[in-house]
């Protein structure tokens, strides 16, 4: 099953990918694994050719792909997980994270808040599972894997 893990910056996508990898599962992060590129408008988008090729690979078990981009609606994911967190948690994670500098400037934080108001409601409508990520990544992974096993 091809599983999309999506959500706003700071929602815990990368942390969940790391936990899934720790468990030996195939998990990819759009921000870290060369699946994203800058667009002409200054934002980042997915290299849909690379993402589609990855999703087309045959393999045993689940394939997890984490990221958030306008292009995600056009790709053949079988299951969509939306990660969310309270605003104050998102902002604190953005201010203190070391793996990715996005979200540390006031302008970027304002963009995340705008996306939270405008984009997250759209993601909720297409999500098969919505999880608040105030729990540790290990617990979030447990819930995701349990729900997938029930399908």
Residue positions per predicted region:
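Conserved substrate/cofactor phosphate-moiety recognition/catalytic segment
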Residues: 15-59
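Conserved glycine(s) of the Walker
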Residues: 7, 12
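Phosphate-binding beta-loop-alpha motif at adenosine-nucleotide cofactor sites
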Residues: 125-140
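A glycine- and Lys/Arg-enriched "phosphate-lid" helix/loop adjacent to the NTP-binding pocket
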Residues: 79-122, 126-129, 145-149
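Structural recognition of the conserved hydrophobic beta-strand(s) that form the central parallel beta-sheet
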Residues: 62-67
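Short, well-ordered alpha-helix to beta-strand connector turns
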Residues: 24, 60-61, 77-79, 126-127
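Short, amphipathic alpha-helical "lid/cap" segments that border enzyme active or binding sites
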Residues: 48, 137-145
């Amino acid at each position: 099953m091809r599983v999309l893990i999506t959500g706003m910056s700071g929602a815990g996508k990368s942390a969940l990918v790391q936990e899934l990898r720790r468990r030996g599962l195939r998990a990819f992060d759009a921000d870290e694994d060369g699946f994203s590129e800058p667009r002409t408008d200054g934002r980042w988008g997915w290299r849909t050719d690379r993402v589609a090729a990855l999703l087309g690979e045959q393999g045993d078990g689940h394939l997890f792909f984490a990221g958030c981009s306008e292009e995600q609606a056009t790709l053949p994911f079988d299951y969509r997980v939306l990660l969310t967190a309270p605003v104050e948690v998102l902002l604190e994670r953005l201010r203190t994270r070391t793996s990715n500098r996005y979200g540390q400037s006031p302008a970027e934080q304002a963009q995340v808040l705008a996306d939270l108001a405008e984009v997250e409601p759209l993601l909720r409508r297409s999500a098969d599972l919505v999880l608040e990520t105030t729990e540790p990544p290990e617990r979030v992974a447990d819930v995701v894997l349990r729900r997938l096993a029930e399908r």
